[in-house]
Swiss-Prot record:
Single GO MF descriptor: ATP binding
Keyword hit for Transit peptide: no
The organism's taxonomic lineage, starting at the top: Bacteria, Pseudomonadati, Pseudomonadota, Betaproteobacteria, Burkholderiales
PANTHER family: TRANSCRIPTIONAL REPRESSOR NRDR
Domain called ATP-cone: residue spans: 49-139
Family membership noted in the UniProt record: Belongs to the NrdR family.
ZnF endpoints (unnamed): 3-34
Gene Ontology biological process terms, A to Z: negative regulation of DNA-templated transcription
Name of protein: Transcriptional repressor NrdR
Domain of life, per lineage: Bacteria
Length: 159
């Protein structure tokens, strides 16, 4: 594989691991010319459905867009990159399992929100506020109240 830093063709695999969800192989590589290290991922290439946007246009499913939107919602939150990758892999699996050739962007947004809900409550609220186009504070309060009803009361932490 070509080095992304110096473009040299000779790189060695230093470490290989199966990702958390088993859907990819993570490889650490070292360039023999510049000695820099980088990470690559090996995944099975599958035919994911086209995304039908609200205006009716169609676009190819882009994993990078899902990862980027989740990373934005999770910015400065204590969630590992591997957890994001695993969540995106679950979304892809759900899309593949439908067998459909198209998925509405609204459905895709709901899948992302479901994954964020399991990863981080704050990220879920951030994403929901943009995705559902919150217009006032009461909509934030509604989502927070929904979480309070869904989870049992927690005892306050001692400081």
């Amino acid at each position: 594989m070509r080095c992304p830093f110096c473009r040299h063709d000779d790189t060695q695999v230093v470490d290989s691991r199966v990702s958390e969800d088993g859907a990819a192989i993570r490889r650490r590589r070292r360039c023999s010319a510049c000695d820099k290290r980088f990470t690559t991922y090996e995944r099975v290439e599958l035919s994911l459905p086209f995304v039908v946007k609200k205006d009716g246009s169609r676009t190819e499913f882009d994993r990078r867009k899902i990862v980027a939107s989740m990373q934005l919602a999770l910015r400065k939150r204590p969630v590992a990159a591997d957890a994001i990758d695993a969540a995106v892999a679950r979304i892809e699996y759900q899309l593949l399992a439908t067998g459909e050739r198209e998925v509405r962007s609204e459905k895709l947004g709901e899948l992302v929100m479901n994954e964020l809900r399991g990863l981080d409550t704050i990220a879920y609220v951030r994403f929901a506020s943009v995705y559902r186009r919150f217009e006032d504070v009461s909509e934030f309060a509604d989502v927070i109240e929904e979480f309070r009803r869904a989870s049992p009361a927690k005892t306050p932490r001692k400081r």
